[in-house]
């Protein structure tokens, strides 16, 4: 593909930068907690981006989109992540919406896609379970057919944003006797349905992001089955292709490496600038090169999507490469920052803005 951006693409970047300067506080670092005021700010930014049509710009107009290029959508995702802008519901916008366009019924598309485009709804993902993580196909949550519904019982865990979510997309086992990849179905579930219990999982620094979800006789209408019964694995795999295909990995990594480079160029240790250490320079340069590789992989994936190609193996490559890259940057960041890396986010004299990586 041609990696040269059009003038209109660069103009769009400038438009996004102007929006960020206008809507974000002057001292914005990208760090938000889970307070009600933080969530309200997230929703406020989401609504403004939705009003601009940015959440769904590459979608068909009939579902709330602008039919813009996929590459333009990639630029939006990159700039939002690089600038640590809140508000974009990746579960709905990046993962579920394109999956519904492939596997959903017309009724499902018309019911859910416009709400996502307008920024009116928060989704969460019901995949991992206490006994099934990496081996997702070993999931045990059951969905039993009963009249016009399926009745769901089981548990999901590590569910991000479930305490804020209106809806969940999930996989459940509909045929326990079938081979494990064949007896799974994909559902859309109302988080306020009777029998849904959300339990907070508080991490070691006191943050609430993950949850455990218990389902006790939760009724899901058959119209909320996405794709064919017992073939939900393929729907879920499509969704994972979209989840893994994002440019977010390289964008967030690029922001952190630039901050580490600035810190190294400005900070003395043992009488010398940190950046004068040839080992540090080499490691920073190597990671900066790998970030550009990750970025180009994401652009290639975006190009494939623009040609109507589902980037199956390419998405997995991008996910593994991007995640490992972030881990390398976090490790180097801790080495460069030293004891500064142990400071709490609330500490007044943090040398770098708070980040998900360092």
Please annotate each region the language model reported.
Residues 1-8, 344-347:
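Intrinsic disorder at enzyme termini
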Residues 3-7, 196-293:
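Glycine-rich beta->alpha junctions and the first turn(s) of the following alpha-helix
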Residues 28-36, 269-278, 292-347:
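C-terminal helix-coil-helix/basic helical segment that borders enzyme active sites and/or dimer interfaces
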Residues 50-119, 161-167, 291, 305-313, ...:
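Internal helix-loop-helix
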Residues 119-127:
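A short, Trp-centered hydrophobic/proline-enriched beta-strand micro-motif
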Residues 141-144:
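A structural signal for short hydrophobic beta-strand segments in well-ordered beta-sheet cores
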Residues 148-149, 153-199:
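A short core secondary-structure module
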Residues 348-354:
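Conserved small/polar residues in nucleotide/adenosyl-binding loops
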């Amino acid at each position: 593909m041609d990696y040269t951006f059009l003038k209109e693409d660069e103009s769009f970047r400038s438009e996004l930068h102007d929006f960020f300067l206008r809507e974000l506080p002057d001292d914005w670092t990208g760090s938000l907690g889970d307070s009600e005021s933080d969530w309200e700010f997230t929703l406020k930014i989401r609504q403004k981006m939705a009003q601009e049509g940015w959440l769904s710009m590459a979608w068909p107009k009939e579902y709330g989109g602008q039919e813009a290029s996929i590459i333009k959508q990639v630029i939006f995702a990159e700039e939002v992540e690089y600038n640590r802008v809140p508000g974009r519901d990746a579960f709905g916008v990046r993962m579920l919406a394109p999956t519904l366009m492939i596997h959903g019924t017309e009724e499902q598309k018309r019911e859910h896609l416009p709400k996502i485009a307008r920024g009116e709804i928060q989704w969460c993902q019901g995949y991992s379970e206490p006994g099934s993580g990496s081996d997702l196909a070993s999931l045990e949550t059951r969905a039993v057919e009963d009249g016009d519904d399926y009745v769901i019982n089981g548990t999901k865990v590590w569910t991000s944003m479930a305490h804020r979510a209106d809806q969940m997309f999930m996989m459940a086992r509909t045929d326990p006797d079938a081979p494990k990849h064949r007896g799974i179905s994909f559902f859309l579930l109302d988080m306020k349905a009777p029998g849904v219990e959300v339990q907070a999982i508080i991490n070691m620094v006191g943050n609430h992001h993950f949850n455990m979800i218990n389902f006790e006789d939760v009724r899901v209408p058959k119209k909320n089955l996405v794709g064919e019964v017992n073939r939900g694995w393929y729907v879920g795999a499509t969704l994972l292709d979209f989840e893994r295909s994002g440019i977010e990995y390289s964008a967030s990594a690029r922001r952190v490496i630039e901050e580490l480079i600035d810190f190294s160029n400005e900070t003395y240790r043992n009488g010398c600038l940190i950046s004068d250490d040839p080992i540090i320079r080499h490691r920073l340069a190597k990671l900066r090169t790998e970030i550009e590789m990750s970025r180009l992989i994401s652009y290639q994936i975006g190009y494939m999507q623009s040609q109507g190609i589902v980037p199956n193996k390419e998405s997995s490559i991008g996910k593994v490469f991007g995640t490992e890259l972030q881990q390398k940057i976090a490790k180097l960041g801790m080495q460069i920052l030293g004891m500064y890396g142990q400071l709490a986010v609330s500490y007044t004299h943090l040398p770098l803005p708070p980040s998900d990586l360092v």
